[in-house]
Structure formats: structure tokens, C-alpha cells
Regions:
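Class I S-adenosyl-L-methionine-dependent methyltransferase catalytic core
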Residues: 1-191
């Protein structure tokens, strides 16, 4: 796994997903699709990733100039990300949390100065809420309900192709969905 662009381009991320349970690694192909849609320059943009895993989406966004908020409830993955942030001296660009994703989003929503331009949602593929809703859909709904997105913001959701996300979730509308192997990458915007 490596950073594909920006100031950190070429750096290797020494993440071994066998050590971290249900964490998947986003392929360079999917990452290039996401960041191709976001654009090469992210200076002044703010990104959230409630299911950070290895942190690779956050590092890539920081490499391109974004301010980043990462969360992962798994203590081992959180520790791995914290070590990379320290080693690569990214503490001024990346805020890291270790809590339930819904509680974390609620906490972020309390700070009205932080509407986000970008969100990357990639929960464990088979994860569901206690009500039986896929966590990918529940997280999209929470982001919409908590007004966390800038009016021109966009959300990228990586999910299993077995889950078909609705065209509309609250104030969010799906603008694109493309298959990458066993994954779908769906994009949502307000409106």
C-alpha cells in the first residue's frame, strides 16, 4: 500500500490486514477513482472518514493538502494510525478519534465551524446496525441528518455489491455508482 500523489507520494503504508481483523485495504485502483473525482488539490478542504481502517484515505487526502478527521473504533487500528501520524509528522493535518462512528459524527456536528467538503465511508461490508440496516446506509443517513456536509460536498461510499444503496438518503442523492471487483463505489451529493 502506498500514497499515490501529493507531498507524501510514494510512501509505503506498512499495514498488514491479517493483523487487524475485518479491515480491508482499498485498492490503488479505487483510491485513484476517488481522488480523481475529488481533484488533485485539496488545500482548504476538510475530509472525514468514520471507518479509517489503515488510515490510507486520510493520509492520501493530507498529502494533497486537506485537513482530515479520522475515526476507527478498533484500538489496534487506532494505534497503527496514531503511529503513522506521529512518524510522518501529520498531527497538524489529521485529527484522530477512537470511538463508535455514530457518537463521533454527533460530536463533530456540535462544532458548527466544521462542515465537511468530503466524506469517505467504508465500514466492514457485512456490518449492520441493531435495526438491521447496513452501516454504510446508516452512516450516510447520519451525515445527512447531522448536516455535516458543505453544500458543494460529496460522499464516497465503498461497499459490497451485495448492498444496493438507495438513490436518495435524506437530503443526499446518489450521482454515480461504479463496480470495482467485488466492491461498488457510490458517490452522493446534497440536493
Amino acid at each position: 500500500m502506498r500514497i499515490i500523489s501529493g507531498t507524501l507520494k510514494g510512501r509505503r503504508i506498512p499495514f498488514n490486514n491479517r493483523k487487524f481483523g475485518d479491515a480491508r485495504v482499498t485498492s490503488d485502483f479505487v483510491k485513484e477513482a476517488v481522488f480523481g473525482a475529488m481533484g488533485p488539490e485539496l488545500t482548504g478542504k476538510r475530509l472525514i472518514d468514520p471507518f479509517a481502517g489503515s488510515g490510507q484515505i486520510g493520509y492520501e487526502a493530507a498529502s494533497r493538502g486537506a485537513a482530515v478527521w479520522l475515526n476507527d473504533r478498533d484500538k489496534k487500528r487506532h494505534g497503527f494510525i496514531r503511529n503513522i501520524i506521529q512518524e510522518w509528522e501529520l498531527a497538524d493535518q489529521i485529527d484522530l478519534s477512537n470511538e463508535d462512528w455514530h457518537r463521533w459524527l454527533k460530536r463533530l456536528s456540535a462544532d458548527a465551524s466544521l462542515p465537511f467538503h468530503l466524506a469517505y465511508v467504508d465500514p466492514p461490508y457485512d456490518a449492520v446496525t441493531p435495526e438491521g440496516m447496513p452501516e454504510s446506509e446508516a452512516c450516510l443517513s447520519a451525515i445527512a441528518d447531522l448536516n455535516l456536509l458543505n453544500p458543494d460536498g460529496q460522499i464516497f461510499v465503498q461497499h459490497t455489491r451485495r448492498i444496493i444503496l438507495p438513490d436518495q438518503i435524506g437530503s443526499l442523492h446518489q450521482t454515480k455508482s461504479k463496480r470495482y471487483g467485488d466492491s461498488l463505489l457510490s458517490r452522493y451529493r446534497l440536493g
